[in-house]
């Protein structure tokens, strides 16, 4: 398989398939796809971890559970993420795992809004 063929195959993958591929590559090569963390952030020296947490601007919305409201949660996940039915169902079924990220890098207001919608549908959600 040429490099171009591999790239085309990756382009045709769904979000769920890409997440599985990344996980498999991490396991196979013992690496992490997470962005490297900076050792020191200019301008925050001497700030306690609690204060840094308060100043956080980008959030990750993580699905922790869905109780007995799976269908309602799937509908809301589809609305928020624009995923297809199968991809949204697969994502909801990953609830409680590190792969159950509904959306990441969102501002606090949007993250709170997403959390509220999901909780109204019966989901248990965490903002990170």
Swiss-Prot record:
Q: Which GO terms describe its biological process?
A: translation
The protein's job, in short, is: Forms part of the ribosomal stalk which helps the ribosome interact with GTP-bound translation factors. Is thus essential for accurate translation.
Specify the protein name. Answer: Large ribosomal subunit protein bL12
Task: State the organism's lineage.
Answer: Bacteria, Thermotogati, Thermotogota, Thermotogae, Petrotogales
GO molecular function ontology, one term from the record: structural constituent of ribosome
Quaternary structure, from the entry: Homodimer. Part of the ribosomal stalk of the 50S ribosomal subunit. Forms a multimeric L10(L12)X complex, where L10 forms an elongated spine to which 2 to 4 L12 dimers bind in a sequential fashion. Binds GTP-bound translation factors.
Enumerate the Pfam families for this protein: Ribosomal_L12, Ribosomal_L12_N
NCBIfam families, per database record: L12
Entry similarity comment:
Belongs to the bacterial ribosomal protein bL12 family.
Keywords noted in UniProt: Ribonucleoprotein, Ribosomal protein
State any GO CC term. Answer: cytosolic large ribosomal subunit
Q: Could you confirm whether the keyword Transcription appears in this record? A: no
Cross-referenced SUPFAM superfamilies, in alphabetical order? ClpS-like, Ribosomal protein L7/12, oligomerisation (N-terminal) domain
């Amino acid at each position: 398989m040429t490099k171009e063929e591999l790239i085309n195959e990756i382009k045709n993958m769904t979000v769920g398939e890409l997440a599985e591929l990344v996980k498999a590559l991490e396991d196979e090569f013992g690496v992490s796809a997470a962005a490297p963390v900076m050792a020191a952030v200019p301008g925050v020296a001497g700030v306690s971890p609690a204060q840094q947490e308060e100043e956080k601007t980008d959030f990750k919305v993580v699905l922790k559970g869905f109780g007995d409201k799976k269908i309602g949660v799937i509908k809301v996940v589809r609305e928020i993420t624009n995923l297809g039915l199968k991809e949204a169902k697969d994502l909801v079924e990953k609830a409680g795992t590190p792969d159950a990220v509904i959306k990441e890098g969102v501002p606090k207001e949007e993250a709170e809004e997403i959390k509220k919608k999901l909780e109204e549908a019966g989901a248990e959600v965490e903002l990170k």
